[in-house]
Structures are given as C-alpha cells and as structure tokens.
Amino acid sequence: MHTYPFLDSHYNPDYWGILPGEEDLSDEEKIESAMKRAQEFAVSQYESVRAYMKSLGVDKPIHIGETGWSTVSDDYFGASGTQAADEYKEALYHKLIRQWSKESGVSVFYFEAFDEPWKDQNSSDGSVNHFGLFTVEGQAKYALWDKVDEGVFEGLSRNGNPVVKTFNGDRQAMMETVALPPVKK
C-alpha cells in the first residue's frame, strides 16, 4: 500500500491543521502536533488495509511501498494552500514514520532519496519535484542533518558535490521558511 498524508493535507484534510485548544502552544509544538496526526493518519490507513485483508481471510504481510513528504510547493501545499511543504515538517514525518515502522515491524519505503526536478516540468517548485531527503545536487535536507554531523556521508558525493546540509546548516534560516498549518475552525 501507499500512504501520503502530505497529499491528504489537501485532498482529505480532516486531520490537518491547528486544532482548537492548540492555540497556546508554541509554533513548533503546533507543527509537531499536526505532524503526529499526519503519522497517525498514515497508520490508520495501514490499519484499514490490514482489517480489510483480514475480513477477506487474507493473512499476508502488508508493506508500505511508498510514503513521504515534500519540502517545496507552489501549489496546493504551499503558502496559498495547506502550508504542509517544508523541511521541518518533512523531518518530523520522516522521524515519526520510521519510529512507528521500527516499533511495529512494518516495512516502509520512504519516498524518496533525491528530489526529481523533472517530474513537474511546468513548475520547478511543484511539490512532486521535492520529496527527496536530498536535493538533486546532493545537499542533505533537515531530516538528515544529524547524519551529516555523525559523518555518515563522509567521502560520498553527488555529481562531484560533497554531501552538506541545506541552508548551510543554519536551523534558524531553515525555520524561517516554515509556515504554520491553517487553524481548524
């Protein structure tokens, strides 16, 4: 199965946004709450598939063949939409879905390693171009900054470019690109 809470922040947004009662949280706590609900939404889709298969008498492992989170969007998921796309939210979703995968024993393919700027040829900022954990040049997005610090990518490169952090590793600069999800009424 595939699950994309990122896309569902627009197409099935019941879980997405800042809920009543969360107004007094810090901005980061508001986003963390929304991202926890995104992870729970993905898990609920998995559980629905599992329940359906069980109702049919099918006893086979279920794998999440794709899930991920885009970091840039000039469409439904950007400033004029759900405001879901940025590196901070991607990092939170990546961490939460990996945590759940490890705890539950469910295999998850996180989509994807590198951005694919050729997917939406009409817009370089189209969300489908930016699901990577790395930019096309090989810069590690925020989800992997800790791995850069640990030296995991030491000696590796992409097209001759060493693996470095996006935003030159400046968390404050990265956070300035982060928008709050909309407030639910």
Model-identified regions with their sequence ranges:
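Aromatic- and acid-rich polysaccharide-binding/catalytic face
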Residues: M1-E40, W69
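Sec-exported extracytoplasmic/periplasmic mature domains
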Residues: Y4, A51-K54, K102
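Extended, well-ordered alpha-helical segments in internal regulatory regions
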Residues: D8, D74-D75
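Alpha-helix N-cap and loop-to-helix initiation/capping positions
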Residues: S33-S44, G81-K89
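Generic structural signal for well-ordered alpha-helices
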Residues: V43-R50, H94-R98
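Short, well-ordered coil/turn segments that N-cap beta-strands
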Residues: V58-P61, S104-V106
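Conserved, mostly hydrophobic/aromatic
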Residues: I64-E66, V108
